[in-house]
Protein backbone atom coordinates (compact mmCIF):
# COMPACT_ATOMS: atom_id res chain seq x y z
CA UNK A 1 0.00 0.00 0.00
CA UNK A 2 1.37 3.47 -0.80
CA UNK A 3 2.35 5.40 2.28
CA UNK A 4 0.85 8.64 3.49
CA UNK A 5 3.45 11.37 3.67
CA UNK A 6 2.87 13.36 6.84
CA UNK A 7 3.87 13.01 10.48
CA UNK A 8 0.42 11.89 11.64
CA UNK A 9 0.43 8.79 9.41
CA UNK A 10 2.68 6.46 11.42
CA UNK A 11 1.16 3.97 13.88
CA UNK A 12 1.24 4.65 17.59
CA UNK A 13 3.64 2.71 19.79
CA UNK A 14 1.89 -0.17 21.58
CA UNK A 15 2.24 1.64 24.93
CA UNK A 16 0.62 4.77 23.49
CA UNK A 17 -2.31 2.80 22.10
CA UNK A 18 -2.63 1.00 25.45
CA UNK A 19 -3.05 4.37 27.23
CA UNK A 20 -5.95 5.23 24.90
CA UNK A 21 -7.46 1.74 25.31
CA UNK A 22 -7.21 1.92 29.12
CA UNK A 23 -8.98 5.29 29.21
CA UNK A 24 -11.70 4.00 26.86
CA UNK A 25 -12.25 0.86 28.97
CA UNK A 26 -12.13 2.83 32.24
CA UNK A 27 -15.05 5.01 31.11
CA UNK A 28 -17.09 1.87 30.32
CA UNK A 29 -20.74 2.45 29.44
CA UNK A 30 -20.31 6.20 29.95
CA UNK A 31 -17.39 6.67 27.57
CA UNK A 32 -17.09 10.26 26.39
CA UNK A 33 -17.09 11.13 22.71
CA UNK A 34 -13.58 12.59 22.91
CA UNK A 35 -12.22 9.46 24.59
CA UNK A 36 -13.92 7.27 21.99
CA UNK A 37 -12.58 9.47 19.18
CA UNK A 38 -9.02 9.36 20.57
CA UNK A 39 -9.10 5.57 20.85
CA UNK A 40 -10.61 5.18 17.36
CA UNK A 41 -7.92 7.51 15.97
CA UNK A 42 -5.20 5.34 17.51
CA UNK A 43 -6.82 2.17 16.15
CA UNK A 44 -7.10 3.60 12.62
CA UNK A 45 -3.39 4.44 12.67
CA UNK A 46 -2.53 0.84 13.58
CA UNK A 47 -1.14 -1.62 11.05
CA UNK A 48 -3.37 -4.40 12.48
CA UNK A 49 -6.51 -4.96 10.40
CA UNK A 50 -8.65 -5.83 13.45
CA UNK A 51 -7.64 -2.56 15.12
CA UNK A 52 -8.49 -0.63 11.94
CA UNK A 53 -11.90 -2.34 11.74
CA UNK A 54 -12.64 -1.47 15.36
CA UNK A 55 -11.52 2.12 14.77
CA UNK A 56 -13.86 2.48 11.78
CA UNK A 57 -16.71 0.98 13.84
CA UNK A 58 -16.15 3.44 16.71
CA UNK A 59 -15.85 6.43 14.37
CA UNK A 60 -19.04 5.35 12.57
CA UNK A 61 -20.83 5.37 15.93
CA UNK A 62 -19.58 8.90 16.65
CA UNK A 63 -20.49 10.02 13.12
CA UNK A 64 -24.09 8.81 13.59
CA UNK A 65 -24.57 9.89 17.21
CA UNK A 66 -22.85 13.28 17.28
CA UNK A 67 -23.57 15.47 14.22
CA UNK A 68 -21.37 18.23 15.65
CA UNK A 69 -18.36 15.87 15.45
CA UNK A 70 -18.94 14.58 11.90
CA UNK A 71 -16.41 16.80 10.17
CA UNK A 72 -13.55 15.61 12.35
CA UNK A 73 -14.56 11.97 11.83
CA UNK A 74 -14.60 12.20 8.03
CA UNK A 75 -10.86 12.06 7.37
CA UNK A 76 -10.24 9.11 9.69
CA UNK A 77 -13.27 7.24 8.37
CA UNK A 78 -11.87 7.76 4.86
CA UNK A 79 -8.38 6.70 5.96
CA UNK A 80 -9.61 3.65 7.87
CA UNK A 81 -11.74 2.46 4.98
CA UNK A 82 -8.83 3.03 2.59
CA UNK A 83 -6.50 0.95 4.76
CA UNK A 84 -9.15 -1.80 4.89
CA UNK A 85 -9.56 -1.78 1.10
CA UNK A 86 -13.11 -0.36 1.21
CA UNK A 87 -12.34 2.19 -1.48
CA UNK A 88 -15.94 3.16 -2.26
CA UNK A 89 -16.58 4.05 1.38
CA UNK A 90 -13.20 5.76 1.64
CA UNK A 91 -13.99 7.90 -1.39
CA UNK A 92 -17.47 8.75 -0.06
CA UNK A 93 -16.14 10.04 3.27
CA UNK A 94 -13.18 11.79 1.65
CA UNK A 95 -15.42 13.54 -0.88
CA UNK A 96 -17.70 14.73 1.94
CA UNK A 97 -14.67 16.20 3.70
CA UNK A 98 -13.41 17.89 0.53
CA UNK A 99 -16.87 19.44 0.02
CA UNK A 100 -16.56 21.03 3.47
CA UNK A 101 -12.82 21.79 3.19
CA UNK A 102 -11.74 22.05 -0.47
CA UNK A 103 -8.24 23.13 0.55
CA UNK A 104 -7.58 20.17 2.86
CA UNK A 105 -4.24 18.83 1.58
CA UNK A 106 -4.40 15.60 3.59
CA UNK A 107 -7.81 14.78 2.12
CA UNK A 108 -6.62 15.70 -1.39
CA UNK A 109 -3.58 13.42 -0.96
CA UNK A 110 -5.75 10.59 0.35
CA UNK A 111 -8.14 11.12 -2.57
CA UNK A 112 -5.25 10.60 -4.99
CA UNK A 113 -4.24 7.38 -3.22
CA UNK A 114 -7.83 6.12 -3.34
CA UNK A 115 -8.10 6.92 -7.06
CA UNK A 116 -4.78 5.16 -7.76
CA UNK A 117 -5.88 2.02 -5.89
CA UNK A 118 -9.27 1.95 -7.64
CA UNK A 119 -7.57 2.33 -11.04
CA UNK A 120 -5.05 -0.43 -10.32
CA UNK A 121 -7.70 -2.79 -8.98
CA UNK A 122 -9.95 -1.98 -11.93
CA UNK A 123 -7.18 -2.89 -14.35
CA UNK A 124 -6.51 -6.06 -12.37
CA UNK A 125 -10.20 -6.96 -12.58
CA UNK A 126 -10.22 -6.39 -16.33
CA UNK A 127 -7.14 -8.61 -16.70
CA UNK A 128 -8.74 -11.37 -14.61
CA UNK A 129 -12.01 -11.24 -16.55
CA UNK A 130 -10.07 -11.21 -19.83
CA UNK A 131 -8.04 -14.23 -18.71
CA UNK A 132 -11.17 -16.11 -17.69
CA UNK A 133 -12.83 -15.33 -21.02
CA UNK A 134 -9.75 -16.55 -22.88
CA UNK A 135 -9.65 -19.77 -20.84
CA UNK A 136 -13.37 -20.36 -21.42
CA UNK A 137 -12.84 -19.81 -25.15
CA UNK A 138 -9.99 -22.32 -25.26
CA UNK A 139 -11.94 -24.93 -23.28
CA UNK A 140 -15.01 -24.33 -25.44
CA UNK A 141 -12.91 -24.69 -28.59
CA UNK A 142 -11.40 -27.95 -27.37
CA UNK A 143 -14.82 -29.34 -26.44
CA UNK A 144 -16.22 -28.30 -29.82
CA UNK A 145 -13.22 -29.81 -31.63
CA UNK A 146 -13.56 -33.08 -29.65
CA UNK A 147 -17.28 -33.27 -30.45
CA UNK A 148 -16.60 -32.65 -34.14
CA UNK A 149 -14.04 -35.52 -34.27
CA UNK A 150 -16.58 -37.98 -32.80
CA UNK A 151 -19.07 -37.37 -35.61
Swiss-Prot record:
Record topological domains on the Mitochondrial intermembrane side: 145-151
S-adenosyl-L-methionine keyword on record: no
Localization, UniProt: Mitochondrion outer membrane
Transmembrane segments: 124-144
Cytoplasmic side: 1-123
CDD domains: Fis1
TPR repeats: 71-104
GO CC, any one term: mitochondrial outer membrane
Chief site of localization: mitochondrion
Taxonomic superkingdom: Eukaryota
Topology class, membrane: Single-pass membrane protein
Gene Ontology BP annotations: mitochondrial fission; peroxisome fission
Gene Ontology terms for molecular function: lipid binding; molecular adaptor activity
Function according to Swiss-Prot or TrEMBL: Has a role in mitochondrial fission. Has a role in outer membrane fission but not matrix separation.
Entry similarity comment: Belongs to the FIS1 family.
Free-text domain note: The C-terminus is required for mitochondrial localization, while the N-terminus is necessary for mitochondrial fission.
Protein name: Mitochondrial fission 1 protein
